[in-house]
């Protein structure tokens, strides 16, 4: 930023985030942050998440850095900018000097909130009382339920609070911030209550427990590096914080508790995952189009360019990239050309309008990400110490509305992604809609003893229902608090918590859906090989039985072969393959129908036994019944042993890295009723990998060749 256009706190580079006079309302900065593609932004987040150090200066913290500190623990170190020390010290000194001069300042010489009319000269005692009365949380120790904030969310809050206080507007000593960073770097996490904050005036109650640990309160506890419970003295020793517990100076207790760090810290974690899940939903939609034999024109750039929404345009371009050159798309095109007037002209909405559905949701998630990144780099306590103007400013930056609103919006977007996923899943397992895949995606030999993903569909309905409930807003449930002083409040942390729940449920859905898509990929592989076997067998039998008459002469039935093979091409394999020669299944019925139709056209020749096609039907069917079941079983066994005649098409597709990860690295396999392994066991593997971030690389590998633009309109 041009230093000539910034107003600082008058105390060095660490004392001010800078205020650009060329963009006084900050809209320019906000717009600049939205440039480029969402995918490139997510790639940048992942890269930053994996860095070994997070350097804090108060101005450049990102959600990926917060997520890294939250979940990677001691793998990532926190470093405080030394240049911020001067500004932090200046604001702390100003508070002490103003106290000594008798200046009346909120929370320094006054009571708090609705009782700020009270006055005291005992500034240190006032801070101690602030922490005591805010320690109002319930942990439920000794009960089955847990009411403790997850350690990851607490670590996120600690990092964000340090970042805010580093900017030098809060009147707190640098040494306290160093102590918090030592707790982070040594993986020592204070125990904070899960509930009890309305995120205005900040997250008072949970943050007071961080202050409680710093001051050595008897009821304060922390969790150590190996999960052990620590009392304050032991926590200080393990963290290497010297000098004993802190005796808070005037304003320092208020500086620690009067901020939005818990809500915005958790929101950062949530959004890091939501952004990745949004990209995953785009790729899963493309794989859905592949296994459903969808028509790829739904991704055509002109369609989306005419709609103007950037999220939609990018979603379509990503799907277009996955489908471009896909072996499934090429094969499906041939199928669509066969009897086109007997098939739907368009795919259903869950496939065809997936870019239009996902696009606005990605825009919402991206916008929320920027809003939360502004919040975690904001100074959000009260009062603010403006050293350069020699005054304390009484305002309301503790109001966490950006968090509540962003999280409500994100949760709605997450729920809508889940709704699309459920609609796609429902089509995938339904043999009325899935273009020839078996009902329930059953992969076994006997569908009467294999119900595939039926239980999974019920679970998906449960997930989706809960997710839709969570989509309801939190921010319209505000209650007037603290003697009507906090009469409007953001409910930021509550909304963040509910969004974290929603993201967790979307991960359950994504895991289940991805395993189902891999099942569908394998079933298409079975389908292709089995159809090839059936065609080969029918062709072989036709040549053997229908070509020659009893005396070696050419027989009229030899002309039936082409139509017989056309039946095999047109009939869904899984409609008959469990018992291919059954008279009640369509294959034998339609093969016979071909022979009957040819016989009816045979005219006078049909009256002659030596040229009658009717006379060939029994021999043809008997030969089919002799050969086909053996050939089908042989083909099944070959596929199961990895020796299929036709390789799996997925290996030729850009979606292959995701399939390969699920099948090879996670060790999942085709689910059938013949095997002991349950669907939930496979879903668990994928869910765990998704939670650990192990799916990020294969997901990004699917898109590594994308140049950030749609294909040209030709």
UniProtKB/Swiss-Prot annotation:
What is the protein name for this chain?
Phenylalanine ammonia-lyase
One cellular component GO annotation, for this chain's record? cytoplasm
**Residue stretches in coiled coil:** none
State where the record puts the cross-link 5-imidazolinone (Ala-Gly).
200-202
Its primary localisation, in coarse terms, equals cytoplasm
**What would be the name of the gene that encodes this protein?**
PAL
Post-translationally, this protein is described as follows, namely: Contains an active site 4-methylidene-imidazol-5-one (MIO), which is formed autocatalytically by cyclization and dehydration of residues Ala-Ser-Gly.
Keywords tagged on the record: Cytoplasm, Lyase, Phenylalanine catabolism, Phenylpropanoid metabolism
Q: Which organism is it from?
A: Camellia sinensis
